[in-house]
């Protein structure tokens, strides 16, 4: 939902921000004050909606299309995190064989170091069940962050994306 004024400082320092399109807003002051001070018309969405915070400010890590989708994103995120600092992240059985070989990896990275390639293909290929849970997908496309599993164990991924601006 909406968060305005001094209360908006709290979400900015939390671990994860999940917003819902058309329903979640974060801003210090609203459109009416902006109008009275700058004489600009700005909507709540433009000022601090999910799109703004997932593409421009980078505050939002995940954005749901609706409440149902947002809740499913939260459940998926929590499936990678321990319940507390004294526990390990959840282990998940996989049907992937431990000695799985994928010949497509031999062709993914070009010989020419100046030629771009899609690092997401590599990430998805090596992770269990070819599944990568990406965070901040629409912010800074030259870097990739998220979670996956190797051998059932949770791993965090931080990677350059050579396909955009030659990576980070």
Language-model region placement:
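Conserved catalytic cores of soluble enzyme domains
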Residues: 1-86
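Short low-complexity stretches enriched in small and charged residues
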Residues: 13, 18-20, 108-117, 148
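Generic secondary-structure boundary/loop-capping signal
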Residues: 23-25, 30-34, 39, 44, ...
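Gly-rich Lys/Arg/Thr-decorated short loops/hinges at beta-loop-alpha junctions or inter-strand turns
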Residues: 32, 53-55, 100-107, 126-127, ...
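Terminal amphipathic helices with adjacent charged low-complexity linkers/tails
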Residues: 62-123
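Non-catalytic terminal/interface segments that mediate subunit docking, oligomerization
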Residues: 114-168
């Amino acid at each position: 939902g909406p968060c305005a004024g001094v209360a908006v400082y709290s979400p900015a320092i939390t671990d994860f921000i999940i917003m819902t399109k058309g329903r979640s807003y974060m801003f210090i002051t609203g459109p009416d004050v902006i109008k009275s001070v700058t004489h600009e018309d700005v909507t709540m969405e433009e000022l601090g909606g999910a799109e703004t915070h997932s593409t421009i400010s980078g505050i939002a890590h995940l954005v749901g299309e609706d409440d149902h989708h947002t809740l499913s994103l939260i459940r998926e995120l929590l499936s990678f995190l321990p319940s507390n600092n004294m526990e390990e992240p959840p282990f998940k059985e996989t049907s992937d064989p431990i000695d799985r070989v994928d010949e497509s990896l031999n062709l993914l990275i070009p010989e020419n170091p100046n030629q771009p390639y899609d690092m997401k293909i590599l990430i998805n290929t090596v992770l269990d069940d070819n599944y990568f849970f990406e965070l901040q997908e629409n912010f800074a496309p030259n870097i990739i962050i998220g979670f996956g599993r190797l051998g059932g164990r949770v791993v965090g991924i931080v990677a350059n994306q050579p396909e955009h601006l030659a990576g980070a």
